[in-house]
Amino acid sequence: NTLERFKYVFSTGAYIDSLTLAGSVKNSFKSESVENIKLLLYRLDSSYTDSAVYNRKPDYVTSTLDSSNYEFSNLRKGDYLLVALNDARSDYIFNPKTDEIGFFKDTISLPRDSIIKSELSIFKEELPYIFRRGKEIRKGQLIFGYQGKPSNLKVETLSVVPDNFQTIILPEKGKDTLNLWHSPIEKDSLIFKISNNNIIDTITVALRKKQLDSLTVTEITGGVLNIKDTLFFSTNNPIIKIDTSRINFVHTDSINISYEAFISKKESTVGFIFEKKFKTSYKLNLYPDALVDIFETSNDTINSQFRTRSLEDYGEISLSIQNPEMVPVIIQLTDINDATVAQETSSENKIISFKYLIPKKYKIRIIYDTNNNGKWDTGNYLQKKQAEPVEYFPDIQEVRPNWELNEVIKI
């Protein structure tokens, strides 16, 4: 049988050290509790440097095990650095590529500090930009992989190409990858310059694929379009031309709908903006040649039918933001898994209303936007920079049809 939380203590001197240190750990951004976090104590003596977490084991180790609380025991009197580590390799060494880290900003002095009242927040650092590689994944489509978050990533074709040669570059959602589609060309390879500010890489990508993929178009709505959403169709190849004369868009009474079609600059999608009505059915027919992709191939006939919900099918959350100190905050509405549904920024007392919500459970996340850049920023250990503070409103918001919830948020 497993002997849990077993301790075996011995001393190489005349007595056993008896000081303790306790506290708790949380995720800096997500609401879920953390488990099995390593807590590391480094003695601040003449041999200590800030790089210690990267290259040597700590002086003391403990773990939260199956909770978010930790406790060190049998500690020696002195000054320490306290670090929390979500240690992917269980080697007690900080690897920024795989590990989350948290640190207590002040020196721990024992026996004065025995209980850390503020929670340690662990975060994943933003890695420095490094270009990885480029390769062809299908004829006419290349991918460029990189590490980190580039601030000004550009791709330039260096090979000699015809005047009508086109490229379309789109980021891959959720990945450190750029997709590049190019016009068909009879070459064995293409040379590109990849630049991010003053970091420049030159690469050659071999072209070996023989068959172009035909254009496929997929409706994203799933048959029901939320009243505040845009109608999108995703495509496997990026679209370069929309012929509205090959599109028929009507609602239930077969009355033509005025709309604006556009090509997304962020994803391989085509969008349709129109005045939506509650509890209405729509038909959208895309006839051949309505959409033309970068390879000059077009769609087959697509018959799409979808509807909108009635006004009574939606709920609403109204938040009274009490912010007397005028602190810049981002108020986010999330689903039960912490994915952002909607957000508003505020640095004053105001009412924020999240309307037309699908009935289900939501959370309210408050980001203290200390640098006022409109987004959450993670921390950095070497810079001794903590992640921007995040709080979750304690109550889950259960939205019901045709109902408004009202809450007060005190900043």
Task: Tell what function each PLM region has.
Residues 1-411:
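N-terminal targeting or signal-anchor segments and their processing/structural boundaries
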